[in-house]
Amino acid sequence: MQILLEDPTKAAQAQVLASQLNQTDYPQFALVFTPERLELRKLDEPKLGAVYVDFVEGAVAHRRKFGGGRGQSIAKAVGLKAGAMPTVVDATAGLGRDAFVLASLGCKVTLIERSPVVAALLQDGLMRAAQDPEIGPWVSERMRLLQGPAVDNLLALPERPDVIYLDPMFPHKQKSALVKKEMRVFQSLVGPDLDADALLPAALQMADKRVVVKRPDYAGWLNEHKPSMAIETKSNRFDVYVMAALAAG
């Protein structure tokens, strides 16, 4: 993994990151420190552009402001009914978009990301978000990141969260430019979640109230385990495994 500097003032950060990633062997990728952020670039396919985490501007910010609040499907799936404010572990954090939505609605969210490269992008995005005057205070309070295998981190949690959220990597059929770009970069970097079926038993063991699994509409149940209910959207489905009712706060 190459680490490139387009902003010389970030040399110290680059050195720390290089020492953290010294066991990762991805010659076709580079992590680039630009003046604005940390970016992941696929060197052999530069037309794919950069992948990075941005909670302050762009699509994620638009979704926070205009995405439907507690009426959106993910909020219903995790149980954000009137007064309930569950603690959530997102065990397959990726670029953190769903975790950010839940945090913006008031949940305390622990993000688990197995890829050290993706975790570095997430950490950079969280750090920049924490410095933003509008969202910084609650991002710092409600979002924390753990790096490592999801099952190991789930089983090592000091307290059982109310909800565990899973969105395992699944081959995408959609042809949208954004999905194609990010999924091509992601799947060539981290590959599919081959241990995805092992996630569900660990999540069911550790969640106090419910487990939510996000699936493409064409995918079967995770681990072939029938959910208590499903909430369907245009292209995805939230399979919900309910263990106990969520108390209103």
Curated annotation (Swiss-Prot):
Name of the encoding gene: rsmJ
CDD domains: AdoMet_MTases
Residues that hold S-adenosyl-L-methionine according to the record: R97, D98, E113, R114, D167
Keyword annotations: Cytoplasm, Methyltransferase, rRNA processing, S-adenosyl-L-methionine, Transferase
Major subcellular location class: cytoplasm
GO cellular-component term (any): cytoplasm
Matches recorded under Pfam families: SAM_MT
Protein name in the entry: Ribosomal RNA small subunit methyltransferase J
EC number, UniProt record: 2.1.1.242
UniProt superkingdom: Bacteria
GO-annotated molecular function: rRNA (guanine-N2-)-methyltransferase activity
Protein role: Specifically methylates the guanosine in position 1516 of 16S rRNA.
Compartment(s) of residence: Cytoplasm
Family as reported in the entry's similarity comment: Belongs to the methyltransferase superfamily. RsmJ family.
Gene3D superfamilies: Vaccinia Virus protein VP39, YhiQ-like domain
Catalytic activity: guanosine(1516) in 16S rRNA + S-adenosyl-L-methionine = N(2)-methylguanosine(1516) in 16S rRNA + S-adenosyl-L-homocysteine + H(+)
